[in-house]
UniProtKB/Swiss-Prot annotation:
Presence of keyword Ubl conjugation: no
Function description: E3 ubiquitin ligase catalyzing the covalent attachment of ubiquitin moieties onto substrate proteins.
Identification of the protein by name: Probable E3 ubiquitin-protein ligase makorin-1
Chain segments carrying region Disordered: 90-114, 154-173, 363-408
Natural source organism: Xenopus laevis (African clawed frog)
Length: 408
């Protein structure tokens, strides 16, 4: 109460002294006097919590100039038609019209090492309506909840630059040497404004992946494209060669079988007759015939020791040799279930395509295949893991010595 009573006394004393009285601020200042002309940024983004009680304007018609998408004006808006801002081109400014009053003559000069030419340039820009239109497009946008970093006038920033650094520096040369990944995959939204290099289109793949200057990169890419094209052509020829092949047992076109898993060929190693994998495996698993009859071809009776599963039909010798080599390499990486890391015995011996390895990684030495009907006393024992052959030999020697002593 004492402070409130002292306020009128100060006003009367100031008036009596011949000075203009200070305005008395009300206890509750009116809300929305000047803020009603400022558009609420939270309302623009649809997250204003105040609603009708907000002191800022919720009328979008009064802020059309602030709703123009600045990325669209640069030509690189990623949202396109889904952008919440307007995609309108900026209006042409009247070069003769003045948009603001002339600046005061008592314009304070900026401190520091700023020459008079930079100051005159700044004053002329302020007199003609401020910085250019494109500078406002590149201005920093204020986002609620983030720190605002202002931008100094262009003339002030250029005034402190040395004469030899006044020209615009080019883009990073390392970036210019790199190809744009977006242009290489199809389309770059930045177009000519992209900082990366857009390559020349390749005649084989149609992508912009050829470096305009690097001849080594161009030749390497063209070589890889030709190799990929040759593989695609080989695949096309293989499909064309296999689509009309008929199985010699079921007499059905292999590629037209109802079950997709049965559309595979069983290639015999020493024969060129065509069979589907299911039929030839069923033929070779019969028990009522001899082994020689089972392993022979149903048509020409030529014996084949194994069958190669294949998705495509192979008839030429060179192609069949490649297929057999790939098949053996693939099987050699899998462990044999009969050998079972040395705990079992494989009936195929050294002719087995699967991997015979012990738990410690040692590979079994090739053993001759066990013939059926051979007596067990003539079988060659296969080494197994966990057996100490030194102790086994010493036990046999002791047994023989005891037998001799008993005879004596």
């Amino acid at each position: 109460m004492a402070e409130a009573a002292a306020a009128p006394a100060l006003l009367t004393s100031a008036a009596s002294a011949g000075k203009a009285p200070l305005p008395a601020f009300p206890e509750n200042p009116p809300v929305g006097v000047w803020t009603r002309h400022v558009t609420c940024r939270y309302f623009i983004h649809g997250v204003c919590k105040e609603g009708i009680n907000c002191r800022y304007s919720h009328d979008l018609a009064t802020s059309r100039s602030a709703m123009i998408c600045r990325y669209f004006q640069r030509g690189c808006c990623a949202y396109g038609d889904r952008c919440r801002y307007e995609h309108n081109k900026p209006l042409q400014e009247d070069p003769t019209g003045d948009t603001c009053t002339a600046p005061s003559e008592s314009l304070p000069e900026p401190s520091g090492n700023i020459n008079s030419k930079a100051a005159e340039l700044a004053a002329s820009e302020l007199a003609s309506g401020g910085p250019r239109a494109q500078d406002w497009v590149n201005a920093v946008e204020f986002v609620p909840g983030q720190l605002y970093s202002g931008r100094a006038p262009e003339a002030y920033t250029q005034g402190t630059v040395k004469p030899d650094e006044g020209r615009e520096e080019p883009a990073d040369p390392e970036l210019k040497k790199q190809l744009c990944p977006y242009a290489a995959m199809g389309e770059c939204r930045y177009g000519e404004n992209c900082v990366y290099l857009h390559g020349d289109p390749c005649d084989m793949c149609g992508l912009q992946v050829l470096h305009p200057v690097d001849t080594c990169q161009r030749s390497q890419h063209i070589k890889s494209c030709i190799e990929a094209h040759e593989k695609d052509m080989e695949l096309s020829f293989a499909v064309q060669r296999s689509k009309d092949i008929v199985c010699g047992i079921c007499m059905e076109v292999v590629y037209e079988k109802t079950n997709p898993s049965e559309r595979r060929f069983g290639i015999l190693s020493n024969c060129s007759h065509s069979y589907c994998l299911k039929c030839i495996r069923k033929w070779r698993s019969a028990k009522q015939f001899e082994s020689k009859i089972i392993k022979s071809c149903p048509e020409c009776r030529i014996t084949s020791n194994f069958i190669i599963p294949s998705e495509y039909w192979v008839e030429e010798k060179e192609e069949k040799h490649k297929l057999i080599h790939k098949y053996k390499e693939a099987m050699s990486s899998k462990s044999c279930r009969y050998f079972d890391e040395g705990r079992g015995t494989c009936p195929f011996g050294g002719n087995c395509f699967y991997r015979h390895a012990y738990p410690d990684g040692r590979i079994e030495e090739p053993q001759p295949r066990q013939k059926s009907g051979m007596s067990s006393r003539y079988r060659i024992p296969s080494p197994s893991a966990g057996i100490d052959f030194g102790s086994l030999t010493s036990e046999r020697a002791e047994t023989r010595l005891r037998t001799r002593k008993t005879k004596l």
